[in-house]
């Protein structure tokens, strides 16, 4: 019996690509090596139909091509070739106006193009039953595969570091400013506990660019972002009560916007900035704290998660 050949087209090389596309299919092939052969291609040649015709299943996340305008039509071509197309979707197609990429999504009508992909795909996989119910209004062939990890992966096996302090942490991405704002005022309440507690802000990142849109022409220009402009700087202001919970020398070091060569210098301080790490090791940061916070606003985009 010949193996079923599966082509996986991840959306990125970070968290979504790893946990929604790459890891599940590596697991599939390892568990059923006699039944499935999996190839992972981040940049498949869209013009070579002979290449795509080698596969019985094509799995993609959100869009099969970086060019959203071509995605729906290409999925329909694959369908006509008898290839089973599976679209994975982990986020609601239209974030709120608070989301940093909302203006770009609206300008380029990306939400409409994602919906078109949902309708075109033979099957859709998603993360929650709530989201599946929403997707089923446009494609009845929807299946829930909850977000999951491999508990045997080394980064998830780190023992919690011992401490005589109560350590609270937040580990996440750059689109959660209005969720983190729920913690405003926390710093004020922690003033009397800063000697026997710590807060770890994990994922700190000053890389990236600012996209500026000309309101009159719609023209977009990009420039490198300045450290103090990043959302991470805003997160830090909220967590530290505008740096009132750190002494002046520590604040001076923080404002250099660099990782400390000697991490022990401020290791006993209430606030701990933990810089971003690769997707293969970032979860090790959970070993640094005892309580993980996940504040989240109640709106359509977040409810689907």
For the regions a protein language model found, what residue spans apply to each?
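Donor nucleotide-sugar binding/catalytic pocket of nucleotide-sugar-dependent glycosyltransferases
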Residues: 119-156
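Conserved catalytic-core segment of nucleotide-activated headgroup transferases in glycan assembly
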Residues: 12-27, 150-156, 161-280
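Membrane-proximal helix-turn-helix segments that form the acceptor-binding/catalytic region
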Residues: 74-80, 104-123
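N-terminal pre-catalytic "stem/leader" segment of glycosyltransferase-like enzymes
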Residues: 1-65, 212-214
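Nucleotide-sugar-dependent
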Residues: 175, 276-305
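An anion/phosphate-binding loop that grips the pyrophosphate of nucleotide cofactors and donors
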Residues: 55, 121, 289
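Acceptor-binding helix/loop patch of EC 2.4 sugar-transfer enzymes
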Residues: 86-111, 152, 164, 218-221, ...
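An aromatic- and histidine-rich active-site surface loop
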Residues: 61-80, 171, 180-183
């Amino acid at each position: 019996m010949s193996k079923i050949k599966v082509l996986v087209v991840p959306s990125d090389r970070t968290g979504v690509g790893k946990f929604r596309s790459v890891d599940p299919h590596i697991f599939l092939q390892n568990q059923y090596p006699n039944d499935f052969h999996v190839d992972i291609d981040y940049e498949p040649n869209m013009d070579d139909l002979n290449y795509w015709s080698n596969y019985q299943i094509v799995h993609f996340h959100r869009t099969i091509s970086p060019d959203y305008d071509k995605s729906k039509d290409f999925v329909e071509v694959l369908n006509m070739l008898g290839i089973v197309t599976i679209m994975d979707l982990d986020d609601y197609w239209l974030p709120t106006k608070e989301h940093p990429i909302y203006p770009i999504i609206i300008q380029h009508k990306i939400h409409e193009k994602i919906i078109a992909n949902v309708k075109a795909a033979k099957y859709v996989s998603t993360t929650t039953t709530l989201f599946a119910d929403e997707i089923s209004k446009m494609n009845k062939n929807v299946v829930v595969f909850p977000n999951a990890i491999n508990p045997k992966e080394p980064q998830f096996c780190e023992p919690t570091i011992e401490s005589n302090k109560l350590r609270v942490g937040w580990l996440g991405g750059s689109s959660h400013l209005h969720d983190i704002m729920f913690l405003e005022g926390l710093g004020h309440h922690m003033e009397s506990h800063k000697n026997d507690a710590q807060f770890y802000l994990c994922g700190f990142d000053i890389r990236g660019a600012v996209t500026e849109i000309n309101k009159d022409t719609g023209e977009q220009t990009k420039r490198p972002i300045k450290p103090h402009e990043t959302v991470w700087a805003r997160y830090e202001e909220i967590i530290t009560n505008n740096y009132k919970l750190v002494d002046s020398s520590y604040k001076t070091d923080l404002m250099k916007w660099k990782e400390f060569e000697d991490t022990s210098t401020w290791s006993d301080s209430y606030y701990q900035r933990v810089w971003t790490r690769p997707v293969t090791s970032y979860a090790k940061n959970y070993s640094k704290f005892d309580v993980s916070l996940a504040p989240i606003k109640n709106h359509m985009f977040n409810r689907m998660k």
